[in-house]
Each structure stands twice: as C-alpha cells, then as structure tokens.
Design a protein with these regions (language model features):
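C-terminal engagement/docking regions of AAA+ P-loop ATPases
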Residues: 1-12, 16, 248-333
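Conserved C-terminal "switch" segment of AAA+ ATPases
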Residues: 11-19, 32, 183-256, 283-287, ...
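Pre-Walker A (pre-P-loop) alpha-helix and adjacent loop at the N terminus of AAA/AAA+ ATPase modules
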Residues: 14-61, 244
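Conserved alpha-helical scaffold flanking the Walker A/P-loop in AAA+ ATPase domains
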Residues: 42-45, 98-118
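Walker A/P-loop
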Residues: 47-84
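P-loop (Walker A) phosphate-binding loop of NTP-binding proteins
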Residues: 58, 92, 160
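AAA+/SF3 P-loop NTPase mechanochemical coupling elements
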Residues: 106-115, 144-161, 172-182
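Conserved AAA+/SF3 P-loop NTPase catalytic/coupling segment centered on the Walker-B
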Residues: 111-138, 152, 167-176, 188-196
C-alpha cells in the first residue's frame, strides 16, 4: 500500500498521463452517439474495474449502439444475445456438434466468446439460461464437453432489461443481480439532443464510422493502474459505514429506515464500491480516491443490493431514497 505523499504524487502523475486516451475514446464514440455520456462513463467504469453492468431502460435509447461503438473504438469483439423464453444454455455458451465427415464431435462456441457481450432483455430468459450466463460472468471460463475454455480479456457483460414490459419475463433473482457491479438506469436524451437525433434519421444520413483509437493493451494497462490507485483508510471506513448502514440503519440514527429495509447489501457492495470508486478516480485522471468518487457511484452500485419491504413499496419509497438518506447521515471524511 502506498504510504508517502511522494508515492501518491507520482501515481497521480502517471494516471493523469495514462488517462488521456479516455478523451479520444469519448470523442470517437461521440461521433455516433448523441448524448448518453452518463451511460458511457458507467460502461468505462465497468471496463476499468472488470465489472459487469446491468442496464435498465426503455427501448430506443441507443444502448446497443453505444456498447457496439465502444467495442469498435477499442478494436474488441462484440456479440449480442437476444434473450427469449425458448433460449437454451447451449445457445449462449456453445455446444458439441457431430461432424459426420470426420466422425467426431467438434466444439461450436457460443456468442459468449467475445470481449463485449450484450445480453439483451436478460429477464426474458428462463432461470437456467440466466444461470449459465451469470456463471460465465463469475468464473470467466466456459466448460463445453470435457474441455474448459478461458474467456478473452477484457470480458464485459452488459445485460439490459425493459422496466415496462413484465409479461412473459423472469425476474432476475437478487442473488444473481448482486453479481453485477452496477445497475444503471438509462435516461431519455435532452430536447436538444433528441432534435439532432431526429434530424439525422429523417435526412437518412449515413452513420459515421467508429475507428479503433485505443488498443487492448492500453485498456489492460489502465486496468492495472486503476487497481493501484490509492485509497486512504478513512475512505475505506466511509465505504464500510455506508454499507453497514443498509444492514443496521439504527446504528447510524436512521431508525425510520429499519421497517423499510428487508435486507441490506452483501459484502459485494463494499468490494464493488471500492473498485468502482477507483475507476471513477481514474476517469477523473486522479491517482487517489476522494469521498466524492464514492458518492458519485454509490446509487448505481447499491440500488440493486437493497431489499425493500411492502411498507416501503406502499409509500413509494425506492432504494434511491434509502441510499440518499444514508449518504446524508453518514459522516464524510
């Protein structure tokens, strides 16, 4: 662990220099995507911290286009899996097929073998398919037949779900949702952004080509540097206070939250707050984490890790309301 001010200063200079590629990446993706800078930054946090992202938003908000454009900008392999009720695990991970000419079984790899995997409408697939995908996310390897295959690095799963249509869907269990680094709610574009989008589509303009501007090696180096970013023990304690407040709010003088929360965040909440805060610091081209980094990613990291009671639902209290009250109460270092 870094201890001296000189160590931190040197790391800060290295991160500031190495983080210059982020501007090129944002500009290149911005040639195609109008707005959605918030979603893009969340995808970059996932990329830097090796964490998978759950995206929630209505159709037509450029989720697929943003992810594909980001993959093209770093010369990564992209695949899209449309989840449906009749999908089988083999359709995701692959299977063994019989080759009559060679009189043997050969492996046919599934779409999971890519750097960026878009799992579209993950809540439309049955539990066994969701489990196959989530196991691959956790293990970062796939077993087909008797052979185990390592998945390429970087490997990032971006799963989407539509908040409007619930008919014919299979709710993602809390234990499965907990595996995602973040749950990001994708919002609508602004009025000005939507006007630009409308004009481009009405005029039938050809979409600009996204060129590779960042190498895979730069991404992997940035990941390692993100892990090295300094986090003071006071910030670590701040993260722990936030997470423990979701479990025992009465210890932080938040007694009114006790009947609202059915269960608090698992230890994955603490881990993911720490790694995402480091990635946020890297996005800010800083070699150390400050409390504002934690606050800025807190809602997206914790919103799917907190269970609410029926009383909370009856009063229209959301996980965001709970997190905001905790952030107001917990002392900032």
């Amino acid at each position: 662990m870094l201890k001296t001010a000189e160590d931190i200063r040197q790391l800060n200079d290295r991160v500031s220099y190495a983080g210059r590629f982020l501007d090129n990446l944002r500009n290149e993706v911005g040639k195609v995507i109008i707005g959605q800078s918030y979603m893009l930054d969340r995808l970059l946090i996932g990329l830097l911290s090796s964490g998978h992202i759950l995206l929630e938003g209505v159709p037509g908000l450029a989720k697929t286009l943003t992810i594909r454009s980001l993959a093209q900008a770093i010369h990564a392999r992209f695949s899209r899996i449309q989840f449906t009720p009749d999908l089988l695990p083999a359709d995701v991970i692959g299977t063994m097929i019989y080759n009559q000419q060679r009189n043997e079984f050969v492996v046919r790899k599934g779409p999971i073998f890519a750097n960026f995997v878009l799992a579209d409408e993950i809540n439309r697939a049955p539990a066994k398919v969701q489990s196959a995908l989530l196991e691959a996310m956790a293990e970062r390897q796939i077993t087909i037949g008797d052979t185990t295959y390592k998945l390429e690095d970087p490997f990032l799963v971006l799963a989407t779900q539509n908040p409007l249509e619930q008919e014919g869907t299979y709710a993602l269990p809390e234990a499965q949702a907990d595996r995602f680094l973040m749950k990001v709610v994708v919002g609508y574009p602004t009025r000005g952004e939507e006007q630009v989008i409308m004009r481009q589509n009405v005029q039938g303009l050809a979409a600009p080509v996204v060129n590779p501007v960042v190498s895979m090696q730069e991404i992997l180096s940035a990941r390692q540097m993100t892990r090295d970013i300094y986090m003071d023990e006071k910030v670590e304690q701040y993260i722990l206070d936030i997470v423990f407040a979701t479990r025992s709010p009465e210890q932080f003088k938040l007694d009114k939250l006790k009947p609202i929360i059915s269960y608090g965040s698992s230890p994955r909440g603490s881990i993911n707050l720490a790694v995402a805060a480091k990635a946020q610091a890297f996005l800010n081209k800083r070699g150390y984490v400050v409390p504002e980094d934690v606050k800025s990613i807190c809602v997206d990291v914790l919103r799917h890790r907190i269970g609410l009671t029926y009383e909370a639902e009856a009063e229209n209290i959301t996980a965001i309301n709970v997190i905001e009250q905790i952030l107001e109460r917990v002392n900032t270092p």
